Curated annotation (Swiss-Prot):
Coiled coil: none annotated. The record marks 178 as: Interaction with histone H4 N-terminus. Belongs to the HAT1 family. It is found in: Cytoplasm; Nucleus. This is Histone acetyltransferase type B catalytic subunit. Component of the HAT-B complex composed of at least hat-1 and hat-2. The HAT-B complex binds to histone H4 tail. It holds the Pfam family Hat1_N. The gene is hat-1. Residues 364-399, 461-508 are annotated as: Disordered. Residues 44-46, 207-209 are annotated as: Interaction with histone H4 N-terminus. The keyword ATP-binding does not apply. It comes from Neurospora crassa (strain ATCC 24698 / 74-OR23-1A / CBS 708.71 / DSM 1257 / FGSC 987). It catalyses: L-lysyl-[protein] + acetyl-CoA = N(6)-acetyl-L-lysyl-[protein] + CoA + H(+).
Length: 508
């Protein structure tokens, strides 16, 4: 290819997504944003060859997300025998419906033909009021033509905002297993308070995996017995036990940083908590931002449930001098019953429970991000020293230390099981050091999330939002608590092993 850098353009910078509405002069732009990723579309380097002054404007009608692609440039590379400018329309035709390539005039005409009483496709699930207005959530199946049409228009957002994300195959024979949730901002029309416009804010896709449930054991069963399964011709597959997986989850940039992701996730979770065939709600390859949002939402919900609140550290458990960590630090039967009731996968439930139990530790031993007098307090916690938390750290009692050690062993036991293969490659001393290092990282992360939970709880009170709108306050993770570097030091954390065994924190 040509070595002239002037002919290369960043696809992330060149591509602009615009949300528009019809106006007397054509279209009015409401919001614009760039994609985070274009590597799945334009290649790993996210570069487009063959243009100078390139602009790719993907316009969307803000309501029904009717797309229109406009490509403009100042100069185009003249093709040679060896190379030519990239055909942008051809590349994007694999990600956009044919209607996206209509003339601008046809696009504007279509916008004006959309009725004032247009509503999103699917069934209205719920509505709620946020700080910036009213929102509605709709759900539907891809087998609904209107749902399929909207999804087909917006699927390019997946490679735009999910690294490595791929659109749903609309022709898959199992397409009926997908359920789509759309989030819309509902706004009253100017001078027409009884009429509303809808503005697309985000969506999520969920897929059902059928889950075989073995029959209960009986005394009469013999080793030669084989379970049988038969259905009549009218059997509804939707009634089979399943694991429902959140596959894609996108809030578009103009609606981010408003707490809408947490709201949508919580609404979806509540829907499947009531959905009898679903035995677990799982998440496919979440990124760090989604992990944080999910952790806080799960913590907010579970910490209000009596069954979850009843899960406590049994301080009567004795700590062995050597050997395995005790398995009865928390009642395992109650743990599993609670997890199944709330349909959360084992690893995620364990993490949220560990976080909650950490918030319940005696103040003298509860880890945090440091105290206000520490030099790095503001950097670590994101709080101003002037906002207080001047309370002195109480001296831990032997009982306090015992409780903390039990909690630490509970967490380390899970981390060891999760990383058994990697840790098994290390010598005993290195294994302990590596496990201590991972534990300290998990402990730090929990402290960070508990601070977020506390601050979101305070914001909910200040904004006057209804109960459940935000994460409730939890015991402070930075109110004069032991600094985590002290915990690391106490645990003998060392540098990473030269054997480079990959040991993970075990996030779901």
């Amino acid at each position: 290819m040509s070595g002239d850098d002037d002919w290369w353009t960043s696809s992330n910078e060149a591509l602009l997504v615009s949300l528009v509405t019809p106006s007397d002069t054509g279209v009015k732009t409401l919001d614009t944003f760039h994609p985070e990723y274009t590597n799945n579309i334009f290649g790993e380097k996210e570069q487009i060859f063959g243009y100078k002054g390139l602009r790719i404007n993907l316009q969307y009608n803000a309501s029904d997300m009717l797309p229109n692609l406009k490509v403009s440039y100042k100069k185009k590379y003249q093709p040679t025998a060896d190379e030519e400018a990239l055909d942008i329309n051809e590349v994007l035709s694999e990600f956009l419906p044919e209607i996206a390539f209509q003339k601008q005039s046809d696009f504007e005409t279509r916008l004006k033909s959309i009725p004032d009483n247009w509503t999103p496709p699917g069934t209205l699930v719920t509505s709620f009021t946020n700080k910036d207005g009213e929102y509605e959530v709709y759900s539907g199946k891809i087998t609904d033509p209107a749902v399929k049409q909207l999804l087909n228009r917006i699927q390019i957002l997946v490679p735009f905002f999910v690294d490595g994300g791929t659109p749903i195959d609309m022709e898959d024979p199992d397409v009926d297993r997908w359920t789509i949730y759309f989030l819309y901002n509902k706004r009253p029309l100017l001078n027409q308070p009884d009429k509303f416009s809808y503005h697309f804010a985000g969506y999520s896709t969920l897929y059902r995996y059928y889950a075989f449930q073995p029959p209960a054991e009986s005394e009469s069963k013999t080793p030669t017995d084989t379970p049988t399964f038969s259905v009549d011709g009218d059997f509804d597959l939707d009634t089979l036990p399943c694991r429902t997986r959140i596959s894609q989850f996108i809030i578009i940039p103009p609606f981010q940083q408003k707490g809408l992701g947490s709201r949508l996730y919580s609404i979806i979770y509540q829907q499947y908590l009531k959905h009898e065939p679903t035995i677990e709600l799982t998440v496919e390859d979440p990124n760090e931002a989604f992990d944080d949002m999910r952790d806080l939402a799960d913590l907010a919900f579970l910490s209000k449930q009596p069954e979850f609140q009843a899960l406590k550290i049994d301080t009567s458990v004795e700590i062995p001098e050597e050997g395995k960590a005790p398995s009865n630090i928390v009642d395992q039967a109650a743990w599993e019953a609670c997890r199944k009731k709330f349909k959360i996968v084992p690893r995620q439930f364990a993490r949220v429970l560990e976080m909650y139990l950490m918030s319940q530790l005696p103040e003298s031993v509860r880890p945090g991000l440091g105290a206000p007098e520490d030099e790095d307090y503001e950097e670590q916690s994101g709080r101003s020293k002037s906002k207080g938390h001047e309370k002195a750290l109480p001296k831990p009692t032997p009982e306090d230390e015992h409780t903390y050690r039990l909690w630490m062993m509970l967490v380390k036991r899970r981390l060891y099981v999760h990383n058994r293969d990697a840790l098994g490659q290390l010598e005993l001393k290195e294994r302990r050091e590596e496990l201590a290092k991972v534990f300290a990282g998990v402990e730090f992360d929990y402290a960070r999330l508990l601070i977020k939970a506390e601050e979101q709880g305070k914001l909910a009170q200040a904004d006057g939002e209804t109960a459940g709108d935000q994460v409730p306050a939890t015991p402070s993770a930075a109110n004069g608590k032991r600094k985590l570097d002290e915990v690391e030091q106490a645990e003998g954390t060392a540098a990473a092993s030269s054997k480079k065994a990959k040991v993970e924190s075990g996030h779901a």
